[in-house]
UniProtKB/Swiss-Prot annotation:
The lineage of its organism: Eukaryota, Metazoa, Chordata, Craniata, Vertebrata. Residues 1-20 form the signal peptide. CDD domains: TGF_beta_GDF1_3_like. It comes from Xenopus laevis (African clawed frog). PROSITE patterns: TGF_BETA_1, TGF_BETA_2. Glycans are attached at residues 175, 206. This is Growth/differentiation factor 3. Belongs to the TGF-beta family. It comes from the Eukaryota.
Length: 354
């Protein structure tokens, strides 16, 4: 992971110098390391879910950085997907059916190496809506798509949830982890069907516009997933030293300040937060003899010893990070989904000779 950070650090530095190019090789490599194919360009970005904003502001739990405490599941990536489905027209009376909606969420951004630990569907109504009448909800998983012009067959669906509810100032949440896990394979993602009925007492056995209008006007659906990328996860972390390093000569290997401003690399339109971060970098000489302050490895100590004897044949050790820490990024991906992701080894805390 230290090698990955060094690559990211170098690419960030090069981007600061070469940002005049539309998309440089360094930027493509950096975006790939961040799990993106191209630079996102959100046109009509979705609002950031409060749950993601709260997790970002709370920060990473240094003792357990790969646990999403807000959801109680392992993970270091949270994505919020907007519904790309459509509302079906109800042309003929169908009892007390108020709404039929096809839901579709594109999970193609989830990589094969990720372990999906939570899939949560949210059905939200306008916040100032309050109606006391009761409705009935049925949620189906589509097993097979119907041909255009053909009736939706009940044989092509599987009932997942049935629930009664009232329109209150809160959302409805449903655990769809198993379904979302299957959707990592696009061939299995046929979407969902949501049906909402008015209670038969209020609807009088037939659909009533007055009763159904609140549902049709104010419904909003989204899907949230939590996944774990094992390659970007450390289960144990040494606690950061609280004492400050003693003064050192300016040419000796040590941590130097480097602030990365995402506006400087042209990323301000898709990176939601932070606006930038203190990345730092390592620079300086590793002279003989290495002192304890330089945190040299055994190999580096031997290398400096050999260099003192044969300076022309053996170079001095390199100044490199010996301790790094993670950051969280909140951003829009290539599908305009909101993503919260923890990245290991993005901040240099200490440097040494290697």
């Amino acid at each position: 992971m230290a090698e990955l950070w060094l690559s990211l650090s170098c690419m960030f530095s090069l981007l600061l110098l070469t940002n005049s190019s539309p998309l440089t090789f360094q930027e493509r490599m950096l975006l790939k390391a961040l799990g993106l194919n191209t630079r996102p360009n959100p046109i009509a970005p979705a609002p950031v879910p409060k749950s993601l904003r709260d997790i970002f502001e709370k920060g990473i739990n240094q003792d357990n950085p790969c646990m999403m405490e807000g959801f109680g599941v392992p993970g270091n990536i949270v994505r919020s997907y907007r519904d790309q489905g459509t509302i079906a027209a109800i042309e003929e009376p169908q009892g007390s059916l108020c709404l039929k909606k096809f839901l579709f969420f594109d999970l193609s951004a989830v990589e094969n190496k990720e372990q999906l630990t939570l899939g949560q569907l949210e059905i939200k109504f306008k916040h100032n809506t309050y109606y006391g009448q009761q409705f009935h909800l049925r949620l189906y998983r589509t097993l097979q798509l119907s041909l255009k012009g053909m009736r939706d067959s009940k044989m092509n669906r599987k009932l997942l949830v049935t629930q009664s509810f009232r329109l209150l100032h809160k959302s409805l949440y449903f655990n769809l982890t198993k379904v979302a896990e299957d959707w990592k394979n696009p061939e299995k993602n046929m979407g969902l069907i949501l049906e909402i009925y008015a209670s038969s007492e209020l609807a009088g056995g037939n659909r009533s516009f007055v009763v159904c209008e609140p549902i049709q006007s104010f419904i909003y659906t989204s899907l949230l997933t939590v996944s774990l990328d094992p390659s970007n996860c450390k289960t144990q972390r040494a606690k950061r030293s609280t004492h400050s390093s003693p003064p050192t000569p300016s040419n000796i290997c040590k941590k130097r300040r480097l602030y990365i401003d995402f506006k400087d690399v042209g990323w301000q339109n898709w990176v939601i937060a932070p606006r930038g971060y203190m990345a730092n970098y390592c620079h300086g000489e590793c002279p003989y003899p290495l002192t304890e302050m330089l945190r040299g490895t055994n190999h580096a100590v031997l290398q400096t010893l050999v260099h003192s004897v044969e300076p022309e044949n053996t170079p001095l050790p390199c100044c490199a990070p010996t301790k790094l820490s993670p950051i969280s990024m909140l951003y829009y991906d290539n599908n305009d989904n909101v993503v919260l992701r923890h990245y290991e080894d993005m901040v240099v805390d200490e440097c040494g000779c290697k």
